[in-house]
A protein has these predicted regions:
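Pre-Walker A adenine-sensing motif
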Residues: 12-29
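Conserved lysine of the Walker
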Residues: 45
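Short glycine-rich substrate-engagement loop in P-loop NTPases that contacts/grips substrate
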Residues: 68-100, 118-119
Length: 443
């Protein structure tokens, strides 16, 4: 347990804005496109929707004009398919919104008088993939001008295929990730004293230990700061995702092999992973399965947004390599809830944190290969490109030569950077930048 992670305010997740996502949504509000929040369960999509509702009301939108459906609530259990969804929305706006729990408290309060909606209307649907054929209702909402639509979902494959089928060119996807370290610090500051403040370097370093240990799910900030409590919560979140979004959805018969695969993936964060390598490992453990089964299981885990895969890129040949992707976790806290926190895994964990930070900043990420040497990350966004090496420490000449030397082999003029936990290392070496990891994360 890290003692300074106290619990002075338990409602933290409900009042800290995640401005990155609010700005992305608001850029498309009142535009004829569906706003799609895609992210793993418990990354905060529901809270983002509630914050959006608050902003709409602050702009003068009546609560009667806002329909919020959360499919994790039994209140909406009767909405089984697209027909139910469409009828519910039409009835809601036609006959009045004062029917109880169809929206957050602020909306139902604003809609206290039964009245039909007048003016622009808004439809927000949480965990939309739980409604069969939902895309048909959403397409009809657009065609009929019934309302401005925001939806969220936690299955990448399901959302992508259904959006492409009926809503091609009429939606914008906004990925939602666990808290970045900067967001984590905002939550922690608000929890301590209800507002933003300047953190000392020592405080930032201590909070980074919390972040490294517990990850970035917003829900951890509502719980007592004890390992047994937080790791139990994280393990419960992981089990919900695995059994609801993977085992049940895909009708996996041998849950034991699937569980062992998940443990293998979580245990090899930041390592090159292939189905053949996993199958060979299982064989050595006298576990019988096939490469095809492993491939299917990995695709299911990836679709649940628990993991990401980064392809390898031949820098000299300028082509993606077909095999040997690296696996990264959406949230390292879930890993520690499953297999515990281990100091010896620090390099892979730091790589994972930088990978997720780059993702949150909008970069497309691959793993570089040059002269059979590896570059941890190639991060690309529009015309911008960065080459990045990540390590725990640069305490030896061998480490310095390895991290900087690999980058020196790349002869283009794009930015090259080594990120480490060395706070006082020189700012550059032979034109290659060095950044202290915590400073990089707080930029």
């Amino acid at each position: 347990m890290i003692e300074t992670m106290d619990n002075s305010r338990s409602d933290i997740a409900l009042f800290v804005d995640r401005e990155r996502y609010m700005s992305a949504i608001e850029a498309f509000i009142d535009r004829p496109v569906v706003k799609v929040l895609k992210g793993m369960r418990r990354v905060g999509k529901s809270v983002i929707m509630r914050l959006l509702i608050e902003r709409l009301i602050d702009r003068g939108v009546s609560g009667a004009n806002i329909l919020y459906i959360n499919k994790e609530s039994l209140v909406f259990d009767a909405i089984k398919d697209y027909r139910d969804l469409y009828r519910y929305a039409v009835d809601y706006f036609k006959n009045g919104a004062a029917r109880g729990a169809s929206a957050p408290a602020s909306v139902t309060t604003a809609a206290a008088a039964p009245a039909s909606a007048t003016g622009r209307t808004y439809i927000l649907i949480d965990e939309v993939q739980e409604i069969a054929g939902w895309e048909r209702a959403v397409a009809s909402f657009l065609a009929d001008g019934l309302g401005d639509v925001v939806i969220s979902g936690s299955n990448a494959t399901l959302l992508s295929s259904e959006l492409a089928t009926l809503l091609s060119g009429r939606y914008v996807e906004i990925p939602v990730y666990p808290l970045t370290f900067r967001e984590f610090m905002t939550f922690r500051n608000a929890k301590r004293d209800g507002g933003d403040r300047t953190d000392t370097a020592a405080e930032a370093e201590n909070e980074f230990k919390n972040y490294l240990r517990y990850g970035g799910l917003p829900g951890i900030h509502q719980l007592p700061a004890h390992d047994d409590v937080l790791f139990s919560y994280l393990n419960a979140v992981l089990n919900t995702i695995l059994y609801k979004d993977v085992i049940t959805r895909h009708k996996i018969r041998d849950a034991s092999i699937f569980d062992k695969l998940v443990r293998y993936l979580f245990d090899n964060v930041g390592n090159i992973t292939t189905a053949k390598r996993i199958a060979d490992y299982f064989k050595s453990q006298r576990i019988r399965t096939s490469v095809d089964t492993i491939l299917n299981y990995i695709s299911y885990v990836e679709a649940s947004l628990l993991i990401d895969k980064a392809p390898r890129y031949d820098i000299k040949g300028k082509r993606l390599l077909e095999f040997f992707d690296k696996v990264f976790l959406n949230d390292i806290g879930l890993r520690h809830g499953l297999i515990g926190y281990r100091e010896e895994d620090i390099n892979g964990l730091l790589e994972n944190i930088v990978f997720k930070e780059l993702q949150a900043r909008g970069y497309k990420i691959s793993i570089g290969v040059i002269d059979q040497l590896e570059i941890d990350f190639i991060a690309e966004k529009q015309n911008e490109k960065k080459y990045i090496q990540v390590c725990y420490g640069l305490g030896s000449e061998a480490a310095i030569e390895r991290e900087f030397g690999n980058l020196e082999k790349i002869k283009d003029n794009y930015e090259k950077m080594v990120i480490s936990m060395d706070r006082f290392f020189p700012a550059e070496r032979n034109g290659i930048l060095h950044r202290y990891l915590i400073d990089f994360l707080l930029e």
